[in-house]
């Protein structure tokens, strides 16, 4: 593996918009990630952008593969998700995965959807976005060459103004 590149992106002024953050896995290895500090400034929500590092997958899937449909073992993918979930202080049973297909469907999810797309099948065919107002859930979306839209508000839905 090559040497890690430290990345720090700032906008005009001094506010950092994307930072690196490492978590320690149960086995002592590191789970490197990126995050948007602006989304965490009030301490209510947490965000994480995974890299390909810090997981258990091998070969062409090395190391933090998060998809099962391409030949990696389900056990490896589940362990990799366990590492992501642990960074959020939870486990894969509280993760909800989406399946993007370049449409415009946004699904509202809640506790009843926990584990969907990972520990149990999805109840919908696709969702290009997921949203929740329930704490303790990890919403997971997958991107390769698309820009992921991320938004957050601490207001309740009926208090939000457009």
Predicted features along the sequence, with ranges:
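A short aromatic-anchored loop/beta-hairpin motif
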Residues: 4-120
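Beta-strand-turn-beta hairpins that frame and shape the catalytic cleft
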Residues: 42-45, 136-137, 148
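Short connector loops/turns at beta-strand edges and beta->alpha or beta->beta junctions
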Residues: 53-57, 146-147, 155
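Soluble metallo-hydrolase cores and metallopeptidase-like ectodomains found primarily
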Residues: 126, 133-134
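Short beta-strand scaffold segments in enzyme catalytic cores
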Residues: 129-130, 139, 148-152
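Short acidic-glycine loop/turn motifs at beta-strand connectors
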Residues: 134-135, 155
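Helix-hairpin-helix/helix-loop-helix acidic hairpins
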Residues: 137-143
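Conserved small/polar residues in nucleotide/adenosyl-binding loops
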Residues: 153-162
